[in-house]
């Protein structure tokens, strides 16, 4: 006769999920204008440059 499977505890379930749902650190590159680290394909928050030209005024950010 078949034996019922044991219940999976909350800790075991959460430990298994934690491995697969791990957050990765964002990929940072150095800004070509000021040297600040920013995410790829984003405007630099310190100087306002993106792809070699200024797209926003950094004084307007604050």
From Swiss-Prot:
GO biological process: translation
Region forming the signal peptide: none
Coiled-coil regions, chain positions: none
Top-level taxon in the UniProt lineage: Bacteria
Keywords, sorted A to Z: Ribonucleoprotein, Ribosomal protein
One GO CC term on file: large ribosomal subunit
Sample GO molecular function, one term: structural constituent of ribosome
Pfam families, A to Z: Ribosomal_L32p
The keyword Nucleotide-binding is assigned to this record: no
Presence of keyword Ribonucleoprotein: yes
NCBIfam families given in the database record: rpmF_bact
Annotated family: Belongs to the bacterial ribosomal protein bL32 family.
Protein name from the UniProt record: Large ribosomal subunit protein bL32
Species in which this protein is naturally found: Treponema pallidum (strain Nichols)
Lineage of the species this protein comes from: Bacteria, Pseudomonadati, Spirochaetota, Spirochaetia, Spirochaetales
């Amino acid at each position: 006769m078949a034996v019922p499977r044991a219940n999976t505890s909350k800790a075991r379930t959460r430990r298994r999920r934690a491995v697969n749902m791990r957050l990765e650190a964002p990929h940072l590159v150095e800004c070509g204008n000021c040297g600040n680290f920013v995410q790829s394909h984003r405007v630099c928050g310190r100087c306002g440059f993106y792809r070699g030209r200024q797209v926003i005024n950094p004084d307007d950010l604050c």
